[in-house]
């Protein structure tokens, strides 16, 4: 009988034998990275996917850079010990802006990060006003401001940092309704503008999960832009040209850092995304 929930680094009994496929890790502090994973899976359905989320240290947006770097390196190391990786995707804007150099120095497989889609948004805007919706950490970091200066210096950039929206996205995947009133309150600075942004960058991987609700609250015709499709294309290129030959015939698997009741409640969601099992990952440090 298949074991659907496992606590600890024990073999996954629910794995279904198949042809070996390149193993790709998608990692986030929470479940927002599933939006990126979905784009990658749509383009590359025949891979062995691992999804890992750090429900112990979630959310990363309020953590120090040193903590994030140490934590992300430790988690990727723990996954790599279980499954040799062909490629890893850090599907978290906050973690990507600070941890990529350390990851690329430590590991010999490609590591793909997620950055706010400032460049395409600057090309799409008609009124020259672009909104960046992200965590407070992403909004404050110099990397984000460098992206704006490089790719959108002729645009008016309106930034909103929100940790509450991350929580709303997590709650939605747990089956809870999203409060449109809460979104209106968060977006109030834009909604009060005489000419609000006509293009909004979803600068946190959690936020595409709220796309339907955001479109109900933002002015009609507002474009929402995220990095998911671009990350999928980059992943495909790297797997073809630079990835090591790291394959597995196991079924797709998800890892949490603590097997809490809240994590267990996510199993049906993870199964809808194609992950057969959820295990606790032992992380050193």
UniProtKB/Swiss-Prot annotation:
Database matches in Pfam families: Asp_Glu_race
Keywords for this protein: Cell shape, Cell wall biogenesis/degradation, Isomerase, Peptidoglycan synthesis
GO molecular function (one): glutamate racemase activity
Residues engaged in binding substrate: 28-29, 60-61, 93-94, 205-206
Gene3D superfamilies tied to this protein: 3.40.50.1860
GO biological process: cell wall organization; peptidoglycan biosynthetic process; regulation of cell shape
Pathway in which the depicted protein is active: Cell wall biogenesis; peptidoglycan biosynthesis
Active site positions: 92, 204
UniProt xrefs under PROSITE patterns: ASP_GLU_RACEMASE_1, ASP_GLU_RACEMASE_2
EC code(s) of this entry: 5.1.1.3
Catalytic activity: L-glutamate = D-glutamate
Function: Provides the (R)-glutamate required for cell wall biosynthesis.
Protein family per UniProt: Belongs to the aspartate/glutamate racemases family.
Protein name: Glutamate racemase
Protein's organism: Escherichia coli O7:K1 (strain IAI39 / ExPEC)
Upper lineage: Bacteria, Pseudomonadati, Pseudomonadota, Gammaproteobacteria, Enterobacterales
Gene name tied to this protein: murI
């Amino acid at each position: 009988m298949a074991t659907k929930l496992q606590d600890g680094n024990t073999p996954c009994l629910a794995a279904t034998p198949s042809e070996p496929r390149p193993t790709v890790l998608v990692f986030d502090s929470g479940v927002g990275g599933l939006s990126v994973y979905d784009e990658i899976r749509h383009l590359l359905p025949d891979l062995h996917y691992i999804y890992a989320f750090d429900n112990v240290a979630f959310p990363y947006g309020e953590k120090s850079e040193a903590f994030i770097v140490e934590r992300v390196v430790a988690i990727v190391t723990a996954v790599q010990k279980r499954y040799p990786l062909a490629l890893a995707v850090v599907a978290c804007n906050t973690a990507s802006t600070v941890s990529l150099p350390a990851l690329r120095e430590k590991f010999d497989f490609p590591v793909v990060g997620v950055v706010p889609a400032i460049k395409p948004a600057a090309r799409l805007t008609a009124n020259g006003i672009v909104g960046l919706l992200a965590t407070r950490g992403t909004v404050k970091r110099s990397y984000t401001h460098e992206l704006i200066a490089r790719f959108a210096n002729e645009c008016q950039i309106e930034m909103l940092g929100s940790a509450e929206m991350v929580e709303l996205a997590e709650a939605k995947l747990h089956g809870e309704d999203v409060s449109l009133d809460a979104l209106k309150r968060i977006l109030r600075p834009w909604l009060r503008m005489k000419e609000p942004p006509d293009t909004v960058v979803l600068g946190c991987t959690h936020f595409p999960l709220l796309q339907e609700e955001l479109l109900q609250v933002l002015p009609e015709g507002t474009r929402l832009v995220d990095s998911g499709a671009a990350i999928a294309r980059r992943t495909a290129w790297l797997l073809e040209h630079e990835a090591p030959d790291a394959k597995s015939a196991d079924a797709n698997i998800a890892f949490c850092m603590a097997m809490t009741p809240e994590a267990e409640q996510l199993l049906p969601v993870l199964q809808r995304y194609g992950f057969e099992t959820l295990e606790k990952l032992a992380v050193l440090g």
